[in-house]
Amino acid sequence: MTNIRKTHPLMKIINNSFIDLPAPSNISAWWNFGSLLGICLILQILTGLFLAMHYTSDTTTAFSSVTHICRDVNYGWIIRYLHANGASMFFICLYMHVGRGLYYGSYTFTETWNIGIILLFTVMATAFMGYVLPWGQMSFWGATVITNLLSAIPYVGTDLVQWIWGGFSVDKATLTRFFAFHFILPFVVLALAAVHLLFLHETGSNNPSGITSDSDKIPFHPYYTIKDILGALLLILVLTLLVLFSPDLLGDPDNYIPANPLSTPPHIKPEWYFLFAYAILRSIPNKLGGVLALVLSILILAIVPLLHTSKQRGMMFRPISQCLFWLLVADLLTLTWIGGQPVEHPYITIGQLASILYFMILLVLMPIASIIENNILKW
């Protein structure tokens, strides 16, 4: 008799995706982040659901409802901080996952890569709207500044902003709709993640060497289930340490001040995971130019497969490209630091240089390095 997991309509799908899936025998810990992102997403949906049971999306009570969750609800504080710091872990895993894709040339799976970019945008939108919900100073002013950027769009900009706001400023209507979208989008992300996996399983996983691994596959279970559990335990360890020892480490103290439309905080800045894009936005003096640069800083990932000029897939055997990749990582860390600094003399220039370098590496230097490496192979 055939095993039920291979015949049952539902079990069959799970079996082909997570149990009998043929996987390359040499994938490293950099391939753990997909499953970690799945864990993060489930954690965020569950903690978010319990928070939504006690949260009220009204400007007069939103701030106090979050305080009520932390003070009066049983284990409300841990749910709230798991959700807030879970978002940080989510983005750490996301950026590692994208970095892995860039380094090992996984972007040659174009469909999977493009769905991944859509996923990235959706998660960023979800996180942004979630940051508005506690209705603190940074929530309110962050929402005001970022939504206001759409007014840079010629002709329809102002109408578009007022349509999103539901009025002439960020107010009750804005908060209510942001809560509605923040609730629904994680399920959209879940559906997109399923499509992401669907496309990935059409081709099979990439591997560090970048060459086909069809001749050397091993079953996903038990080899990679065990490996993924190790990654998951490390993720949970880091998250637990964050939540229990320094839950506000990655947050902004200004968000403990209730939103006040009449007083602007000295430094308006988003959560740490958006700072690199925020730095790119601020480095261009023109409003529309800044908005375009902001969108392109992520959308540029869609152009990466078109600029792949190397004869090799990954960067494992390409030293020049490796140097450029790590320069890109350092550049992104610099941009993240600049995004959190005030708009003053040394920071403005550093931000502009780092922004130029970011686009230069991806659009110009990487393709040139690949051509040079191709020629080195001939010698």
UniProtKB/Swiss-Prot annotation:
Keyword terms, alphabetized: Electron transport, Heme, Iron, Membrane, Metal-binding, Mitochondrion, Mitochondrion inner membrane, Respiratory chain, Transmembrane, Transmembrane helix, Transport, Ubiquinone
CDD domains attached to this UniProt entry: cytochrome_b_C, Cytochrome_b_N
Purpose: Component of the ubiquinol-cytochrome c reductase complex (complex III or cytochrome b-c1 complex) that is part of the mitochondrial respiratory chain. The b-c1 complex mediates electron transfer from ubiquinol to cytochrome c. Contributes to the generation of a proton gradient across the mitochondrial membrane that is then used for ATP synthesis.
Subcellular location: Mitochondrion inner membrane
Residues where a ubiquinone binds: 201
Gene for this chain: MT-CYB
Cofactor section: heme b
Gene3D superfamilies: Cytochrome Bc1 Complex, Chain C
Protein name, UniProt field: Cytochrome b
GO annotation, cellular component aspect: mitochondrial inner membrane; respiratory chain complex III
Record's subunit section: The cytochrome bc1 complex contains 11 subunits: 3 respiratory subunits (MT-CYB, CYC1 and UQCRFS1), 2 core proteins (UQCRC1 and UQCRC2) and 6 low-molecular weight proteins (UQCRH/QCR6, UQCRB/QCR7, UQCRQ/QCR8, UQCR10/QCR9, UQCR11/QCR10 and a cleavage product of UQCRFS1). This cytochrome bc1 complex then forms a dimer.
Location (main, coarse): mitochondrion
Pfam families in alphabetical order: Cytochrom_B_C, Cytochrome_B
Membrane in keyword set: yes
Domain of life, source organism: Eukaryota
Family listed: Belongs to the cytochrome b family.
Membrane topology: Multi-pass membrane protein
Note: Heme 1 (or BL or b562) is low-potential and absorbs at about 562 nm, and heme 2 (or BH or b566) is high-potential and absorbs at about 566 nm.
Keyword Ribonucleoprotein carried by entry: no
Cofactor note: Binds 2 heme b groups non-covalently.
Cysteines engaged in disulfide bonds, as pairs: none
PANTHER family attached to this UniProt entry: CYTOCHROME B
